[in-house]
């Protein structure tokens, strides 16, 4: 196992996982465990959410609650499969009472996300919702208006194409967001080429 220190935490370069971190006292207090990204380490598409919720904190995987079910369903609808994409979060620990992660907390976790993306070398990074979009792009984002658009973002020492997408939870509260969500996922699959991964054409 290859581990090294990253800004106060410990990073496992083989598993692409944060194995220890206590940089954010409030998150250390509220979390049950660190929730790392899941999916292939050579995925063409990397989805970045906001932070773990209650289900994710309990199970130790991102997007396993209702939002994750919506994401899985829509991925299948556009010819993708969860097993062939990487899913991770801006912040790896559950914020108390499911609040948005503070700016400092996002910055504390940025080095982990940068290393994860750099190791995977995806064709495209897709930000799910306002928090990850604004964090990676460094500006205010109108998610609904900009959904499906691609911008360049410097993450760590490298620059990656980033596509803005509405958060799957938004489709639960506002069904009118559903079409934009589906079309953005379809555009992401097309951008990555041949359904995002060579195996995805079977779905």
Give the role of each language-model region.
Residues 2-203:
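A polyanion-binding, active-site-adjacent surface
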């Amino acid at each position: 196992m290859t581990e090294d220190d990253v800004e106060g935490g410990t990073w496992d370069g083989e598993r692409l996982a944060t194995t220890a971190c206590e940089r954010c006292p409030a998150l250390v207090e509220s979390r049950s465990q660190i929730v790392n990204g899941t999916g292939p380490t050579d995925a063409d598409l990397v989805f970045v959410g906001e932070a773990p919720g209650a289900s994710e904190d309990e199970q130790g995987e991102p997007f396993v609650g209702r939002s994750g079910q919506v994401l899985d369903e829509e991925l299948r609808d556009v010819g993708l499969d969860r097993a062939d994409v990487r899913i991770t979060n801006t912040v790896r620990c559950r914020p108390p009472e499911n609040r948005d992660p503070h700016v400092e907390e996002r910055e504390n976790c940025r080095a982990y996300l940068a290393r994860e993306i750099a190791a995977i070398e995806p064709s495209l990074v897709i930000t799910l919702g306002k928090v990850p979009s604004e964090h990676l792009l460094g500006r205010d984002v109108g998610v609904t208006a900009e959904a499906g658009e691609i911008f360049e973002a410097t993450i760590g020492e490298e620059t990656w194409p980033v596509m803005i997408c509405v958060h799957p939870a938004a489709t639960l509260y506002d069904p009118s967001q559903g079409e934009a969500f589906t079309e953005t996922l379809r555009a992401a699959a097309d951008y990555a080429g041949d359904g995002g991964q060579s195996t995805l054409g079977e779905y």
